[in-house]
């Protein structure tokens, strides 16, 4: 009986407090949490945005470009994700990596009726290099301590219930 109690306790520790990877295409969990120094990009007014200012929040960095068809496809669902109830500790940064002017990026958002997200820029592709991006869209998810724990390579439907429930575990 004592052995059974210990076994059940160990199962609870190993399985009861972890979030399993949902069956979501393109989602890759990071085996070792990654910490990056100097994660800085620009807002629409060309002011620096530093991720360290957002410690304590679940962060999503979505790298996109106006010429990217899959980016255009997923952006409305990313916009909706920012407004999901129960994810009030989530901050999403859609970061344009093409070397375009603000007007073109704003037109892209207006054309897609994006209302919950602001536009950010990595025109010098400093972050794209730092994160070793291979293409767009790529989404990087950081925990509340600023450590990368997941990536999405390619597009997904951010409105997917399995994805939202998985994200709520970290919120």
For each feature predicted by the language model, list its residue ranges.
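Thiol/disulfide oxidoreductase modules built on the thioredoxin-like
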Residues: 107-115, 122-166
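Short active-site neighborhood of thiol/selenol oxidoreductases, capturing the structured segment around
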Residues: 50-72
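Active-site acidic short loop of glycosyltransferases
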Residues: 54-57, 87, 114-116, 133
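N-terminal "domain-start" segment that seeds a small globular fold
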Residues: 19-51
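Structural microenvironment flanking redox-active thiols in thiol-disulfide oxidoreductases
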Residues: 73-112, 123-129
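Sec/Tat signal peptide C-region and signal peptidase I cleavage site
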Residues: 14-18
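Sec-dependent N-terminal signal peptides
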Residues: 4-13
């Amino acid at each position: 009986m004592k052995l059974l109690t210990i076994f059940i306790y160990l199962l609870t520790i190993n399985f009861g407090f972890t979030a399993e990877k949902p069956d979501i295409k393109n989602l890759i969990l990071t085996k070792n949490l990654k910490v990056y120094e100097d994660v800085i990009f620009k807002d629409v007014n060309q002011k620096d945005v530093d991720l360290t200012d957002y410690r304590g929040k679940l962060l999503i960095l979505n790298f996109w470009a106006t010429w990217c068809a899959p980016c255009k496809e997923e952006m409305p669902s990313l916009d909706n994700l920012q407004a999901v109830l129960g994810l009030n500790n989530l901050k999403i940064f859609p970061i344009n990596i093409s070397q375009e002017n603000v007007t073109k990026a704003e037109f892209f958002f207006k054309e897609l009726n994006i209302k919950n997200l602001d536009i950010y820029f990595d025109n010098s592709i400093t972050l794209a290099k730092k994160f070793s991006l291979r293409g767009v869209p790529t989404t990087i998810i950081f925990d509340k301590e600023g450590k990368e724990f997941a990536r999405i390579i390619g597009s997904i439907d951010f409105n997917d219930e399995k994805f939202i429930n998985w994200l709520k575990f970290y919120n």
